[in-house]
A protein has these predicted regions:
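Hydrophobic side chains in well-ordered alpha-helices
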Residues: 3, 53, 117-120
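Glycine-rich N-terminal segment of FAD-binding domains in flavoprotein oxidoreductases
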Residues: 23, 28-93
Length: 204
């Protein structure tokens, strides 16, 4: 079992907790999944902190469970499946990094919610691709990756269509980019400097 101090060493104090009440809040949801309490909850705020957390967990063979939406949860996918798993709460990673009206693209962190993005888009006369009855505190990325059904199929090819590209941290801590985010350029910022919008050419 990994210690609280080991995670604090990579992301700092105040963002790792073993408080029994907090752990209990992640142990069950509104599904039929059997409850299981995590060992710790860590709350990174940057990509580099996520990488550090994943690398540490990989080295120690600790299982991680990402959570990006606020409660309540319903599918059982935020409940640990094994003993001593660690919750990675991504709700503090809630920056809207970029909105491009011309290409209808928003670049968001995993903790950005429908309520948060919709308020920003309305200022520019746009709206998000909204699934059926989303909670205001539901993570946009979480909803799209869970393939929640859309109410406007006219504007989407399939349930994964809204994700034009992504930046992922895989199990060993390596960062990879998908879709239009693969390049050219080493970073999303490099792409934007030359007019890139992180979309594949055929994306509508």
């Amino acid at each position: 079992m990994i210690s609280k101090n080991e995670f604090q060493a990579v992301i700092g104090h105040g963002r790792v907790t073993d408080d029994p009440k907090v752990l209990e809040s992640y142990a069950a949801d509104n599904s039929y999944t059997a409850p299981k309490k995590p060992a710790l909850v860590v709350s990174p705020t940057t990509r580099d902190e996520v990488i550090a957390v994943v690398k540490l967990a990989h080295a120690k063979d600790v299982k991680l469970v990402p959570v990006s939406s606020g409660a309540p949860h319903f599918r059982g996918d935020t409940i640990p499946a094994v003993k001593d798993a660690v919750i990675v709460d991504l709700t503090r990673m809630n920056r809207i990094e970029w909105i491009n009206r011309r290409n209808r693209v928003a670049c968001v962190e995993p903790g950005v919610t429908f309520d948060q993005l919709q308020r920003e888009l309305e200022r520019q006369g746009m709206r998000a691709m909204i699934p059926l009855c989303p909670r205001g505190n539901k993570s946009i990325i979480g909803a799209y990756m869970e393939r929640e059904p859309f109410t406007v199929p006219k504007y989407a090819w399939d349930l994964g269509d809204p994700i034009a590209s992504s930046e992922l941290i895989i199990g060993d801590g390596t960062m990879v980019r998908t879709g239009g985010g693969q390049g050219p350029g080493k970073t999303f910022e490099d792409q934007r400097k030359v007019g890139g919008a992180h979309k594949l050419p055929l994306s509508s």
